[in-house]
Amino acid sequence: MRSVAVAMEQPLHGPPGLSTILARTDWAEPWLLGLAGFHVLCFLLTCFSFQHYRVQIGHFLCMVCLVYCAEYINELAAMNWRLFSKYQYFDSRGMFISLVFSAPLLVNTIIIVVNWVYRTLNVMTELKTLQQRIKAEKDKKK
C-alpha cells in the first residue's frame, strides 16, 4: 500500500501510459470496486438483453450517454475527489476515466452493435431464401 502512495506522488514525465495508470491505481478503493461491480452488471445486462430488443436499445442508449458525459463526470470528479478517493486520478486529459469508465462501456456497446449486425445479416439471409423459394414455386406453376 505504501508503494502505491509513493508512486502516486511521483511527478509524471509526459502523458502517462496504460501500464503507468494501471500500476499507480489503488484497485482496493471502495469506489473503484463499486465501479467494477457496475461494469459487471452492465455486461450481464448486455448478455441477458439479447432476446429483448427494447431493453437492449435502452441499455445501449444509456451507455452511449454515459460515455458522452464522461468528460463532465471527469471534471466533477476532479473537483470532488477528496470526498470519495484517496488519490487524485482525474487528470485534464481524461485518461483515467477513459480507461476505467468509458472503455468498458464502449466494449458493451460494441458487443450490442455486433449482435445487431449479426441478426440483420441473418434476417437478410432468411429473406433472400424465402424470395428464392417463392420464385421457384412460381416457376413450377408455369
From Swiss-Prot:
GO cellular component, one term: nuclear membrane
Coiled coil feature spans: 120-142
Residue ranges, Nuclear side: 51-56, 115-142
Source taxon at top rank: Eukaryota
Cell compartment(s), UniProt: Nucleus membrane
Positions on the Perinuclear space side per record topology: 1-29, 78-93
One Pfam family per UniProt: TMEM18
Positions of the UniProt region annotated as DNA-binding: 115-142
Annotated keywords: Coiled coil, DNA-binding, Membrane, Nucleus, Transmembrane, Transmembrane helix
GO terms of molecular function: DNA binding
Transmembrane segments: 30-50, 57-77, 94-114
UniProt topology in membrane: Multi-pass membrane protein
Keyword Nucleotide-binding annotated: no
Listed PANTHER family: TRANSMEMBRANE PROTEIN 18
Entry's family note: Belongs to the TMEM18 family.
Protein name, UniProt field: Transmembrane protein 18
Organism from which the protein derives: Gallus gallus
Top-level taxonomy: Eukaryota, Metazoa, Chordata, Craniata, Vertebrata
